């Protein structure tokens, strides 16, 4: 009888051990987050938008002198050293914006496709304002990333055509044709200007706090935003550092100056008069 009881305990212990090891036989799902998770998690959605900021070429190191005769790098694999010693090729281009620029535009296209579905706030009026604000930033960032792609990869062909880059306004999927031809430089300019126009409609000129409820923009009064405090929650000084309407106009000025320059002016409809007008707007 004592042996039977002992066997029962042994069997019970074994069953618990096997139950606790079920994960060994049934692997857990991969920890990959799906796109549908952005709808109820605004911070996740902002990660898509944030990529457009993070990949901008504003972190240039101070040691770029090694691309000239003024300094020398001891790192033989350094891209700037290769650039200075005659190895500047398509596979070794320290000034390239292709990978980061194209990736940024892909993320921004996904964001623009999904932004209206994101629950930015529990309050519906705040949700609509956040949607406008983030969408305006995305349009401006797409324009800015396309500008850097044009500046680095646009140019004249042997037969005298001024080409830009493939102009993408929809997210690419794994089944898409990636052999897209380059759009003309002017077509890329038109897309940039169009995106900046959209950004200007959605963003405030500057992120300043309103002090009077009567100053709430009419389009937001119409949807029920009644107080300056509600407006400031989305468009107030707390948002400084993000792209504003004025920054979008500054981007337009940069783009027009590039297009009107001697390098590109003969292939565009932009001249220095337009560049000056755009600069004056800022």
Regions found by a protein language model. Give the residues of each.
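Conserved, well-structured interaction surfaces
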Residues: 41, 46-47, 79-156, 173-190, ...
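Surface-exposed intrinsically disordered loops and tails
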Residues: 182, 206-237
